[in-house]
Regions:
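Alpha-helical metal-binding/catalytic segments enriched in His/Glu/Asp
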Residues: 98-102
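Extended beta-strand/beta-hairpin segments
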Residues: 1-96, 106-191
Length: 191
């Protein structure tokens, strides 16, 4: 899968073109298996939890690098019982992850086609009936839609091309996870 950017360009919008080119050549056209891992533990007080982003495997090659060792502290709004607003709420984090994933996909594609971005942002919104959440009942019908707006700017690029570029974000992994029904398997370990 070739990149149409000039061979003289080493970087587009902060993305190193030789590394991007090598990545696309390595993954080829076939299926690419990417295994991701996260571990979340309750912090023993209120709704505080800490998520640890672990190693990943790409095509069976496990990457255990310090660069993949991130921690996210979660909590809920201070207005909720037992909460101190010491970190983002889990649903807000999903919305933020969606925006970040759309930006990643759009920025990579922009670099791939040689578009130098000046601005790129995503605003994500969701409304839902929280009654099911508070009553601990089936909430599947309480979530109706997630909406997002992409703001994109690049000099010397037509509005049509920018619109096409912004639509690439719909193919990001988080968009796909949220927009299709997916099997969620659970295992309960009681100690």
């Amino acid at each position: 899968m070739g990149l149409p950017v000039s061979a003289k360009q080493d970087e587009v919008s902060g993305i190193p073109i030789p590394k991007l080119r090598a990545f696309y050549e390595a993954i080829g056209d076939g299926p690419v298996v990417l295994d991701l891992e996260a571990y979340v533990e309750w912090q023993g007080r209120g709704t505080r939890a800490t998520g640890h982003i672990g190693p990943f495997s790409l095509m069976g090659d496990r990457k255990e690098r310090l660069t993949r060792s991130y921690t996210i502290r979660y909590d809920d709004w201070a207005e909720m019982p037992g909460c101190e607003d010491s970190g983002p709420e889990a649903v807000e984090t999903v919305l933020s992850a969606l925006g970040a994933c759309i930006i990643n996909q759009t920025a990579w594609h922009a670099a791939r086609i040689g578009v130098v971005l000046e601005e790129l942002s995503v605003k994500v919104n969701m409304s839902f009936d929280a009654q099911g959440f508070f009553q601990n009942t089936d909430q599947t019908d309480k979530f109706s839609a997630i909406t997002y707006e992409i703001h994109i700017k690049a000099t010397g690029v037509s509005k049509r091309k920018l619109t096409e570029l912004a639509n690439v974000g719909r193919n990001c992994p988080v968009c796909r996870m949220l927009s299709k029904e997916m099997v969620l398997k659970s295992k309960v370990l009681v100690h």
